[in-house]
Amino acid sequence: MKTKLNIYNMQLLLFVFLVWDPARLVLANIQEDEAKNNITIFTRILDRLLDGYDNRLRPGLGDSITEVFTNIYVTSFGPVSDTDMEYTIDVFFRQKWKDERLKFKGPMNILRLNNLMASKIWTPDTFFHNGKKSVAHNMTMPNKLLRIQDDGTLLYTMRLTVQAECPMHLEDFPMDAHSCPLKFGSYAYTTSEVTYIWTYNASDSVQVAPDGSRLNQYDLLGQSIGKETIKSSTGEYTVMTAHFHLKRKIGYFVIQTYLPCIMTVILSQVSFWLNRESVPARTVFGVTTVLTMTTLSISARNSLPKVAYATAMDWFIAVCYAFVFSALIEFATVNYFTKRGWAWDGKSVVNDKKKEKASVMIQNNAYAVAVANYAPNLSKDPVLSTISKSATTPEPNKKPENKPAEAKKTFNSVSKIDRMSRIVFPVLFGTFNLVYWATYLNREPVLGVSP
């Protein structure tokens, strides 16, 4: 029984092998022939499309305006240079238009081609108005894509890296916001020949990759699109504009500038708590803090272009500098009045000593005169002489010595100016910080859209 079953299985396998394998070979040959036929068909289609095609002439020449639909996909945005007022952007730049001369009929609705075909047909002469430098990537092959639909609609995509100008208004720096434009349009064709249209709405015509931001000092808030017409001596041209809205991050500047300035001002106010006779210590505090503020103000300006107006950081540094310099002037004032106090104390002590010596001399002179006048009478009378000899010589009444006031009490006393400064300076500086930060941090970012 088992032997019969094995024989049956072997016969079945043999039958499948003899029948299926030739069928598979025939099917493979048919598919290969179809592929060869498709290649032949598409080659003929391309040859027919290019036969008599003049890529020097735009589509619809003399009949209609060529409409070019555009959209942008941003793969990388940044960095942004404040000193040069420019930014770098890496994009897939897509353009779509219709060319009736490229209609075809075939087994496929879309022909997917590379850059070689793009050089043989008419393409828009798009350029970037505010671009300083533009690079078309060519590694390992030119990064270009061309698709032709059977109705003559073409999609032309290329990868570009553009360095574009970004006008900045730095009055609110570093709490500022900017709108960096990307402007492009036709170089040779006026609005009566070629016009540009955004393919989708504002959010879809310009898209940024989720991980496309390359910004360390900015947040990319979003983007907007627009369209305008400019006039020149050669005619009117369509200009497409995409604005990228940026808000600066303040964290770096808080650590680099604001905190050092605040700590320097606080350090300058420590001198109010030192004795006013500590001239070297208070001088070191004043001079060191002034020099520190000067260094901070210079370093803060190095990361900015040389603008003719003051920024928000400049105002903060200027006020901090004024507080530090005022602390030094306060010490000079206290020291000046301290020296005058020494002179007054010295004069009072000297005058008291002179008056004391003069009173003693007057008393001694009076006593000497009295003795000289009455001495002869006492010598003639023996009784009086005896009494005078036995009597003790009267001494002038001595007044208690007036000890001069110790100068140390006047010199070591705390100055009224220091007492006032300990309260006034911190209160004023705290009020300034409260007003400054409340004003700038609560202000809505003003995105200036440049024309």
Swiss-Prot record:
Which residue ranges does the entry give as Extracellular-facing topology?
29-249, 301-311, 442-451
Instruction: Kindly list the positions annotated as binding 4-aminobutanoate.
Output: R94, T157
Q: How is this protein activated or inhibited?
A: Activated by pentobarbital. Inhibited by the antagonist bicuculline.
Molecular function (Gene Ontology), one example: chloride channel activity
Reaction equation(s) it catalyzes: chloride(in) = chloride(out)
Membrane topology listed for this record:
Multi-pass membrane protein
Give the signal peptide as a residue range, or say none if absent.
Answer: 1-28
Q: Which domain of life is it from?
A: Eukaryota
Keyword Coiled coil in annotation: no
Keywords of this entry: Cell membrane, Cell projection, Chloride, Chloride channel, Cytoplasmic vesicle, Disulfide bond, Glycoprotein, Ion channel, Ion transport, Ligand-gated ion channel, Membrane, Postsynaptic cell membrane, Receptor, Signal, Synapse, Transmembrane, Transmembrane helix, Transport
Where does the sequence pass through the membrane?
Answer: 250-270, 281-300, 312-332, 421-441
Does the keyword section mention Transmembrane?
Answer: yes
Q: What is known of its domains?
A: The extracellular domain contributes to synaptic contact formation.
Its quaternary organisation is: Heteropentamer, formed by a combination of alpha (GABRA1-6), beta (GABRB1-3), gamma (GABRG1-3), delta (GABRD), epsilon (GABRE), rho (GABRR1-3), pi (GABRP) and theta (GABRQ) subunits, each subunit exhibiting distinct physiological and pharmacological properties. Interacts with UBQLN1. Interacts with KIF21B. Interacts with LHFPL4. Interacts with SHISA7; interaction leads to the regulation of GABA(A) receptor trafficking, channel deactivation kinetics and pharmacology.
Q: What does the UniProt record say this protein does?
A: Alpha subunit of the heteropentameric ligand-gated chloride channel gated by gamma-aminobutyric acid (GABA), a major inhibitory neurotransmitter in the brain. GABA-gated chloride channels, also named GABA(A) receptors (GABAAR), consist of five subunits arranged around a central pore and contain GABA active binding site(s) located at the alpha and beta subunit interface(s). When activated by GABA, GABAARs selectively allow the flow of chloride anions across the cell membrane down their electrochemical gradient.
Q: Which family does it belong to?
A: Belongs to the ligand-gated ion channel (TC 1.A.9) family. Gamma-aminobutyric acid receptor (TC 1.A.9.5) subfamily. GABRA2 sub-subfamily.
Identification of the protein by name? Gamma-aminobutyric acid receptor subunit alpha-2
